[in-house]
Structures are given as structure tokens and as C-alpha cells.
Amino acid sequence: LPYGRIASFLREVFGLAPSEGSLVNWAREAKRNAQPAIEKIKEYIMSSSVVGFDESGCYCNKRLDWAWIAQTVYYTLLFRANGRNSKVLTDKFGDSLERMTAVTDRHSAYFALQFLNHQVCMAHLLRELQYLSELKDKQDWSDKIANLFREAIHERNSNPSAIIPKASWLERLDNLLKLNICNFGKKFETLKKGLIKCRDYIFNFLEDPMIPSDNNGSERGIRKLKIKLKNSCTFRSDFGADALLELHSIVETAKKHNKTPFNAIQALFEV
């Protein structure tokens, strides 16, 4: 929420009357005290074997920036950059990317990087297939691929620790991708080409139980930023943007360790 609305909320609900300047000073103190923890979170992510990535546009000082998230089962790091190309991650994480399995959407920047392994988000693909099924309901090509993906996800969920060979699943997918769907329209052809391009990264979650089939963790982690931008549309300062992303990193990481957001923020004022 903007500082003015926070001050209004504290006044109306709790009878407190901090000035907006006090709120800024508290945010500045929390951000400063959070730096050692932010660096430690980054180190843990760089040493992690499976990392989910996502990015979202955010306006700051009337300028389009990009908020990025890198997250694992135990850690979340959000940060701001002026672009959404692969160089952002290279500059941030260096050669540690080569030791990671990345879980991402199909944004081209992720495929320009040399990850150890890669998994595309099945939830994204299923949404795109559902859209095509609704767009043209007199065909079953998109439904067949969606059912194949759901079957693979069910197989993993039913056998959470098993190493499941992906060869037979790829063969079934290839048979569907060989079908002529020119008559279905451009959007079908576009998705078909996209699936062919990322074919090798669709079923990797079957062969490694540590790899999730979706990137929902990254989407959840960046969702509060989108809510903030719906409320106030933009960040008025670089400090405000960075403070929100860094404090959100602290809170999300704390929650993954069964700590409350209140305790996480409170700890920043006890340093």
C-alpha cells in the first residue's frame, strides 16, 4: 500500500498517528538491516540444485523496469532490473546457473542460458491448450496433448519418489506434434512450434523427483508485487521498489521456514 494509505489505516483501525516520513524511515531501517539476510538468501539460491524463475514488469519513476524472482523450496529472492533478457540472470548469479535445474515459463531469455537442466511450466502449457480447446471446440488435438500432460503429472504425483523414464512420453507427444493442424489456424501452429522448440524440457520432471512440474511457486512469490501495482500503479522511487522486493524476499523466505511475516519484520528492528 502507498504510505498515505498505510498511515490512514493505522490511524483509523489502531488509533496510531505515524507520519508518512516515519513510515519511510522505518522502511529504510528495515531495508538496511535486511542486507545480510538478502546476501545469505542469494548464496543459498546460488548453491541450490533446482530454482524457479519468473519476471514481471513494474513501473518505477515513470520507467518500465522488471521485477525478477528466483526461488526454491526454502528461499525466495526478488530483485529489480532494467530489462528481462538473459544477461540479468547472468549478472546476478554468474556461473552458478550452469549447476542449476531451472523451472521457468517459455520466455526466450531462459533458453539463452546454459542451465544444467531445464523444466518448462506445465501449468502454463495447460492454460494455453485450454484456451485453444475453447477457441476451436470441433478439434481434439489440443485436448489430446493436454490429457497427455495431465497423465504425466498424475504419474509423478502417484509416484513422488520414482525415476520415471520420459522416452515413451516423448514418443506420444511427438506423434501428436507430427499431425497436420494447418486448418486450425495460426494460434494452433504457433503453439505447436513452441512445443517442438521446448520438447526436450517438457517431461524432465518425470526423471528427477526433485523437479516440480510447474512454476507456481515463482508465480505465487511475485503475485504481491502485482497486487501492489494494481493499488498504486507505479513506484515513485527506486528505494521504494527495492525496499518492497527485499522485504518481500525476507517475508517469503521466513514463511518457507514456518515463521510468521510479523516475526520476520520484527527481527529486522532487533539487529
What are these regions (language model features)?
Residues 1-271:
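Catalytic center-proximal scaffold of phosphoryl-transfer enzymes
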